[in-house]
Regions:
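A short, N-terminal "cap"/entry segment at the start of jelly-roll beta-barrel domains
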Residues: 2, 76-166
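Short, conserved beta-strand element in jelly-roll/cupin
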Residues: 1-12, 162, 168-172, 180-197, ...
Length: 239
């Protein structure tokens, strides 16, 4: 989930492909690939990232990044800490991350820009993906990833990635979802509008860029209360 413009690029040398994404765009990048990103707007930008499963694992760095870091006096350790060798000594060389060898690099997957576009849904194209919620006629929903179900209605995902979480967008000027309860983790992230969340009788309002982590097993409801269309991302644990 993005605010402003971001460039995403991939491959061991960062030249296999790239895509420019803007506010409200969604991309789900496959695992087992090198990727990088940078803010390409003229202003401060925000990127909200959801990592699959409970354990995101460790970061695998490209050999060039490790080489550039070492030349600047910075060393990456296997606990993902960063050591400035001008200020701190490395007490155990075995914990320094070593560059991957050529045969190890061959195990990573490769994607063209056209391949990755299949895993991108742009906000400007949202009308192609919206599904009207028959239960709430004021709601439109896009389900991006994994199965999303609300009040016995299921929404099919647009991106075929098994991530351990579902990602959906609730849209509408009067959009709302009546009370429901979940045993698993759920997070709301506001793209636009103002959303009133009632959680076990306590109310809070979130606005653009705000995030709310819903306590497990709580009874919650949400509704859009601004005078304009609102867009709310719903991220839900599925595994």
């Amino acid at each position: 989930m993005l605010f402003r413009s971001w460039r995403f690029y991939w491959g061991v040398d960062g030249t296999e492909g790239e895509v420019i994404l803007k506010k409200g765009d969604i991309a789900s990048f496959p695992t087992n690939m090198f990727r990088g990103f940078q803010n390409v707007s003229d202003e401060e930008a925000l990127m909200f990232v959801v990592l699959g499963e409970n354990d995101p694992g460790v970061i695998t760095w490209t050999p060039k990044l490790l080489k550039d870091a070492k030349e600047s006096g910075m060393v990456l350790m296997n606990d993902n800490s960063l050591i400035d060798t001008e200020k701190q000594k490395i007490t155990d060389e075995t914990k320094v991350i070593q560059p991957l060898k050529d045969n190890e690099l061959e195990s990573f997957d490769h994607y063209s820009s056209e391949d990755i576009e299949k895993f991108v849904i742009r906000f400007n194209d949202k009308d192609q993906h919206f599904v009207d919620d028959d239960h709430y006629q004021s709601n439109k929903i896009i389900n991006y990833i994994d199965q999303f179900q609300i009040h016995d209605k299921s929404f099919t995902p647009n991106i075929p990635h098994a991530t351990g979480f579902s990602l959906s967008l609730l849209n509408g000027k009067s959009a709302h979802i009546h009370e429901y309860k979940l045993e698993k983790s759920e997070v709301y992230h506001c793209l636009s509008g103002e959303w009133e969340i009632d959680c076990d009788g306590d109310k809070v309002v979130i606005k653009e860029k705000d995030t709310f982590s819903v306590p497990k097993n709580s009874l919650r409801s949400i509704r859009q209360i601004s005078d304009h269309d609102g867009n709310l991302f719903i991220i839900r644990q599925t595994n």
